[in-house]
Amino acid sequence: NFSGTGNTLHCNNRYVSRMVLDSLRSWVQLGHVNGFRFDLASVFNRHVDGSVGLEDSPLVSAIRADPLLGGVRLIAEPWDAAGLYQLGSAFPGKRWFQWNGKFRDDIRRFVKGDQGMVAAVMCRLYGSDDAFPDDLFNACHPYQSVNYVNSHDGYTLYDQVAYNERHNWANGEENRDGHRDNFSWNCGWEGDVGAPAAVLRLRRQQAKNFCCLVMLANGTPMFCAGDEFLNTQFGNNNPYCQDNEISWLDWQRLEDNRDFHRFFSKMIAFRKSHPTLARSRFWREDVRWHGTGADIDMSFESHQLAFYLDGAAENDADLYVMINGGWQQQTFTLQQPLSGWRRVIDTGRDSPGDILELADTPPLASKELSLDGRSIVVLVRPRRPA
């Protein structure tokens, strides 16, 4: 039962493998599908008796060698329901994109306020080179890391900041189903009923922080439909059996959360307009890590970090990102010459001041910037024509 649902196929049986290949080819030829995402894809790496040890899955090899399937996008959830975890170079599909569960959990824990997470967040923003090494033997690329915080499995983005506990009673399994460890934080109030205005505002700010970190990280960003307007499943983190308002997209929330939708849309546009963020290789010498000052504090108690990303190699602007994951207001000092920098993103501000066009922002007047608790600031320095 490696799928958790009792219907696992032995994918490396030659007849089953042929069925899978024929099905994929049919979808590409007849349905013009240009990509596939494989749930619990580590099942591919199981022997017939369920043991692990295949150096390369015959099915994955067949997909790689197929002239039709070789050109489509392949995405793996690189684990299964029985404990096999193959994130990054451990997965047999060397060119596959992979859902990065470490990114999800580390970013959740940092935004939640867990201690000891600064070093992990640095690694995730950099492109998760611990999982996707680009040495000669592995030859991975950071874009293979699918960076996400929420998906169809588990909480929505809004529920991630609105619930501490799962609320799956409607599923009929006495609230025992669904993930127990969600690394969520409700901002001081469980659910929406009676939630104070200050709690609701903090939730929006935390959701913007999640959006920021996903969009600023090297790799391939992913979010779930509805997260861009704070859709909710009312705390249900396993609504597989719900064909009702629990699992449906509530389009009224788009109307109610236009300000957040604006922020989300502009963050996507910001990423697309700055190729220095999403590279085929890691940032390497183009990035410099800082804390509130020149040196980064990676102690267990630290919740702050910053980084400068030189955009020259991509003919892009320079970026300076300041991240305050702690409760208290913090003063960050820009570790670059002051000239030319403008503040374009500040999750501590209300809309529309939370994200602005470069032309609408004044030059910085000081190297010292005060960041509210649990907020992210992004500075941009346009590149002057040569």
Segments from the language model and where they lie:
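Substrate-binding/active-site clefts of carbohydrate-active enzymes
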Residues: 1-68, 84, 134
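Flexible glycine/proline-enriched surface loops and loop-helix/loop-strand junctions
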Residues: 5, 141, 244-248
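Conserved alpha/beta catalytic core and glycan-binding cleft of carbohydrate-active enzymes
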Residues: 32, 48-50, 54-225, 229-230, ...
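Short, solvent-exposed loop/helix junctions and linker helices
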Residues: 10-17, 53, 142, 204, ...
